[in-house]
Amino acid sequence: RKISRRSFLSAAAVCGAAAALTACGGSSSSTAASSTASSAAASSAAADGQKYTVGICQLVEHAALDAATQGFEDALTAQFGENVTFDFQNAQNDSATCATIANGFVSAGVDLIMANATPALQAAQAATNSIPILGTSVTEYGVALGLTDFDGTVGGNVSGTSDLAPLDQQADMITEWLPEATKVGLLYCSAEANSQYQVDVVKAALEKK
């Protein structure tokens, strides 16, 4: 009996969550719980010898993104050993290259695409509606994918983890530390959807105070 593709994808999703926790400095207890769950989902893979290929599109070399990718690879390798192989591609901070990479993964027929950062996720979603996609280092999926009435679940073939910070608490911290402040400067990149989203949320929170 071979492990089902669904079981592999379930284990990969849990490994992705564990990797995101590691990259963001998450608790060891949460990571341990994720590891236990992924072990249960993947226990029969090594014995049955089913082979899987994961395409990884990472936007750019960056310490946090590198850690998320490495943690994801390490976690899946720990569960599946030689039964999983990775095709890692770095887009060199270019959205067009992300699209080229994603289309290449689709042509190659990979079993799963791990999209590391928002442009990588956007490119992967545009490239396929059938190959499962796991996003990481993505702040807000609704904004990144242009979803209306986003309720926290993307649906379809896209899932993943979010690195969204507690923006309301950050606004509270500003007013607590600087109660007399009347003007607050917010640095962000207007070309990046998640950056725009965060500054809008913080601005709205500060205007209420």
Q: Where are the model-predicted features located?
A:
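Rossmann-fold dehydrogenase core element
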Residues: 151-161
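Bacterial lipoprotein signal-peptidase II cleavage site
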Residues: 24-38
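Stable alpha-helical elements in mature extracytoplasmic
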Residues: 64, 68-72, 97-101, 116-120, ...
